Each structure stands twice: as structure tokens, then as C-alpha cells.
Amino acid sequence: GSGRIINTSSVVGIYGNFGQSNYVATKAGVIGMTKVWAKELGRKGITVNAVAPGFTMTEMMSTVPEKVLTGIRDRTPLGRLGEPRDIAYAYLYLASNEASFVNGATIQVDGGLTL
């Protein structure tokens, strides 16, 4: 058999974020769970990976003050926030045959923010 499991985490699960202990803990937990499942299910031909989006221009971000958004852009090597399609491409890749040997990975789609 074979299959794909693609979990959703967040870059804050990798680097932490002030004042968000509960959110950071759950997203870091998803990364750990992804690694364990990759080991357990890999023998059955199932790959397990995670996508960790960075700050992405969605409706949720519309309430963030422009000053904060500017600060995020300034800290991001690519100089912008992500678009939903940027995140979607990571999922498409992990679901594809081209990713058949990728297992236990967390892909950070963040424009380099976590470097």
C-alpha cells in the first residue's frame, strides 16, 4: 500500500512566538507527531509530512496593524508575506509522486522568515 498524510503546523511551532504558548505548543506537537507517524507508517508505504506556513495574507491577517505587517516583511528575506497559493503549492508537492521519498519533513513556507 501507499498513501500520503500531510499535517498542518506553523512556523511558530518551530521558533515560538511571544504570548502564544498554547498555539505554539500545539503546532510544535504536530511536528513531533509527524515525525513519529513517518517512522511508524513508512513501513506501510505511507509518507507523513507537515507544512509550516509563515505569515500569509488571509482574512485573519486583515486585523493586524500595518506597522506589524511591515515589521514582518522587513524580517522576511523575500520581503513579503505569503499568499494562499504559496502554501497550496507545498501541499500539492507533498501529495505528488515527486515527493514519494520525502517522509517526516516539515516544509517551512515562510519566505525565509525562520532562517
Residue spans for each PLM region:
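Residue(s) in the substrate-gating loop at a strand-loop-helix junction
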Residues: 10
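Active-site helix of classical SDR
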Residues: 26, 34
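Conserved catalytic-site region of short-chain dehydrogenase/reductase
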Residues: 13-15, 115
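Alpha-helical segment proximal to the catalytic Tyr-Lys
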Residues: 39-43, 100
